[in-house]
């Protein structure tokens, strides 16, 4: 559970930015000088370092060991360059990916289905898979998840193919190539993750993964997860310096 009301004007709140050429003490007097830090629940994070970590800096706030998902020991590991602007792990690409989950849930709502929660782990898995699939041009099959993939220009909506075109085929009794559509409307799926990579020779690579296996502390409502992400995103890119 995250307290979105914890934005304070001093270091006593859950969230604050303290910067400028000042000494800042926390948790027993550890001090920093001349930089800007994000403070979350008593722990300070250097903003420059967090930007370099891209989405992983955010994912680690929920699960400190999640970076291990990007080091699976497969050759696919090489395709993730954490924090790179065109990588699925860039903060901006993660922000864009969250819109994909919103769109998916709107489509599910039209079928009377429950909203998919966002899994922090599935966000990491989607980023890893999508980075690799930008080169492999196929599913890599490392993780046991349902997956939709698409390649196309940045202005293209992957749901035009995954949902609109495949639903039309399904409704006409053409069932040969409707797997993406069926993933979207599968009522056994309860959680999801989404990613966008900009490295593909065909433009962007879009990837969405699905599962019905929820882990405690890993799954959140869309409102809670997106709200927490945007607090972090805005704090990192538009810090309000206090003090």
Predicted regions located by residue number:
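Generic structural signal for short, solvent-exposed loop/turn connectors between secondary structure elements
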Residues: 12, 27, 33-36, 130-157, ...
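Extracellular adhesion/carbohydrate-binding repeat motifs centered on closely spaced tryptophans
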Residues: 1-56
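Generic detector of short, well-ordered, non-transmembrane alpha-helical segments enriched
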Residues: 13, 104, 122, 172-176
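Short, charged/polar, Gly/Pro-enriched secondary-structure boundary elements
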Residues: 23-24, 46, 136, 215-219
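A well-ordered secondary-structure block
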Residues: 141-242
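Short, well-ordered surface patches within globular domains
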Residues: 55-145, 181, 187-199
